[in-house]
Each structure stands twice: as structure tokens, then as C-alpha cells.
């Protein structure tokens, strides 16, 4: 109906400020009354640069930033401002000797986190590898648990603040997460005053995160998620949509002879396809790209030319880029991965 007034009123009352902001940007008619103008002014008070939190996010952030406990847990849905909170916390505790470490579970998350932190804290020395440490008095380390553990074990340094991303991994019993538990213990051994902040979307009870040296954990939880995903299932050439309220699948009209045809029929301007293993991913990507025509585009030609020049002529992804398809996995060199990721985000012709 294009009538956003009910959604606008609901969002104002429940503090869903990003929704209010979006509606006001696209419907100036809602700024006709004095009350609506006042709402706009009040909401803008919560904005920091380009980031606008919900009221629940804002309140949780303030609680975390003012909490003096040495162990804090922030439980919130994925993509709900965790990186923003980490940056705000670092800015608050920042000093000339600050040593902080952000621990990410995989190498693939290193550069993503680095770009965000570097943009917000450009004046700080940032380490991405334990070998980058050269005796600095102050730094922000963005590391995997393996690299952080090597840094503490082999170098004369310690952390004042430790930010654990995907903290629920502590519950797993594999080697990587045993290393994470060792890292937390060693951080406290080397600096008893080390403050640890745990971030996760999945922790049921934060007391389960207790490791050596932890008495109580302050927990802050985001209960209301304004972003609800829609789930579709493709099976036996048919597609269904999942209703989370009735826990039931409803079959949709139409038939699709292959999964590739289903994807192509429902594609948007940008589409992220997740495959579980690098070897399998490359095979699936090649088969998928075979469904697409070659693109005639100066932008695509320029990307291909650059890859041939800086990687090699027979690089497998060249034939895929011609069709607007790229892939990313942890075994790609970082400089290639960063370039491909940037071009995929900024080139309209690359849809998959």
C-alpha cells in the first residue's frame, strides 16, 4: 500500500530507530507535524557518524561501556553492532600504553575486522600477525587464537583488554577452541587485571563462559531482533518457504529442474552463495557459471586484465569473472582475496 505510517509509529514507540530513519528518508510527508520533527531530532542524538542503533542497542552499549567488571558478555544476533561496540569500548579505554586484542575464530575474518577497526582508529598501531609485534608499548592486535597465543608465549607482552568474537566456540571440543581457552587463561596469568569481553549470538547462559580467574560475568543481551531472515528450501525440483511461527514449510508454485535454475530464477543484484568446503565450492561454482553467458563489459575486462597481470594468465577465476561470478575461500592469498572482494562489492556486473 506504500503507507508506512503504521510501521513508522510502531518503530518510534519501540525504539527501532534505523527503521524510522529509513522511512523518513523515503517519505517526507511524515515530517509535516511538530511531533515528527521532534522525533527526528531526538533520534539523531543517538547517531554516531553513519551508525544509528536501536534504543535497546544504545542502552546495552551504555551499560557495557560503564561496567567496571573484568568479565563482560554481550549476547546479540549476528550483524547487530558488535564491531561498533568493540570500537567504542577501545575509544573509551584508549591511552598511550593500551594493549588490546580482538580474537576472531578464522583467518577469513581478520581483514574484515581490520578494515572496520582501522577506519575508526586510524592512529593506533594494528597487528594482524604475531610476527608484526616489534616491542610496541601500545597496539591493537586483531588475531586468531593461534597467533594471539604465540604472541603471548614468545614475546614479552600482555593484553589489557581481550575481545573474544564468537565466544560460544569455547563450548566446542576441537583443538582450535582448546587454544582459545588456553589464551584466556594465559592472558590472565600475564596480566591479572586483563579485562575480557565475550561476544556471541548463541550463548544461553554467560556463566558457562567462565574460565580460570573468572568469578562473575556481567551479561547484556539484545532480545528484540529487527532483522528476521526468510528461509526457502529447494528440494526435489520444488521450492518451499518456512513459516517460523507455525514451524512449517509451505510449497511455492513453479518447478526448477536444477538448483542452479532455482538460484538464477530468484537472483537479485548481489547474491552470496555459501558452500561448505573449498574443493567442493570450486566444482559447484564452475558448474553454476556454465549456466551464464559471457559478459561484454569494460569493467569486467579491466578486472581480468589486472588478475592476469598480477596473478597469472591461467588463474581459474578468470573464466568465471567473464560470467559475473567470483569465489572466496581461506586458501586464496590475502591480496587476491581482498581485491576480488572489493571488486565484487563495487562492480555491478559481478552478481554472484
Mark where each language-model region is.
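N-terminal helicase ATP-binding lobe
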Residues: 1-352
Amino acid at each position: 500500500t506504500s503507507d508506512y505510517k503504521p510501521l513508522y509509529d510502531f518503530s518510534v514507540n519501540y525504539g527501532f530507530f534505523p527503521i524510522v530513519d529509513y522511512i523518513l528518508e523515503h517519505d517526507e510527508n511524515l515530517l509535516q507535524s511538530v511531533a515528527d520533527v521532534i522525533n527526528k531530532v531526538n533520534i539523531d542524538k543517538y547517531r554516531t557518524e553513519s551508525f544509528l542503533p536501536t534504543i535497546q542497542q544504545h542502552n546495552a552499549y551504555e551499560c557495557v561501556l560503564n561496567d567496571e567488571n573484568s568479565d563482560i558478555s554481550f549476547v546479540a544476533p549476528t550483524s547487530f553492532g558488535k564491531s561498533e561496540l568493540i570500537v567504542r569500548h577501545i575509544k573509551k579505554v584508549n591511552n598511550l600504553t593500551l594493549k588490546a586484542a580482538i580474537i576472531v575464530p578464522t583467518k577469513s575474518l581478520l581483514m574484515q575486522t581490520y578494515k572496520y577497526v582501522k577506519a575508526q582508529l586510524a592512529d593506533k598501531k594494528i597487528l594482524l600477525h604475531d610476527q608484526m609485534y616489534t616491542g610496541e608499548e601500545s597496539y591493537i592486535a586483531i588475531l586468531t587464537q593461534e597467533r594471539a597465543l604465540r604472541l603471548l608465549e614468545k614475546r614479552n607482552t600482555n593484553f589489557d583488554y581481550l575481545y573474544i568474537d564468537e565466544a560460544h566456540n569455547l563450548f566446542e571440543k576441537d583443538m582450535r577452541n582448546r587454544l582459545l581457552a588456553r589464551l584466556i587463561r594465559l592472558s590472565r596469568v600475564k596480566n591479572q587485571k586483563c579485562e575480557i569481553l565475550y561476544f556471541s549470538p548463541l550463548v544461553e547462559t554467560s556463566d558457562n563462559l567462565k574460565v580460570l580467574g573468572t568469578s562473575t560475568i556481567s551479561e547484556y543481551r539484545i532480545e528484540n531482533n529487527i532483522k528476521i531472515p526468510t528461509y526457502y528450501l529447494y528440494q526435489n525440483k520444488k521450492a518451499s518457504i518456512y513459516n517460523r511461527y507455525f514451524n512449517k514449510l509451505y510449497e511455492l508454485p513453479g518447478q526448477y529442474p536444477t538448483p542452479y535454475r532455482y538460484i538464477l530464477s530468484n537472483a537479485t543484484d548481489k547474491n552470496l552463495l555459501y558452500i561448505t568446503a573449498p574443493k567442493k565450492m570450486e566444482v559447484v561454482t564452475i558448474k553454476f557459471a556454465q549456466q551464464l553467458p559471457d559478459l561484454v563489459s569494460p569493467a569486467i575486462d579491466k578486472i581480468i586484465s589486472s588478475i592476469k597481470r598480477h596473478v597469472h594468465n591461467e588463474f581459474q577465476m578468470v573464466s568465471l569473472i567473464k560470467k559475473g561470478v567470483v569465489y572466496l575461500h581461506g586458501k586464496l592469498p590475502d591480496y587476491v582475496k581482498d581485491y576480488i572482494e572489493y571488486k565484487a562489492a563495487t562492480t555491478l556486473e559481478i552478481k554472484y
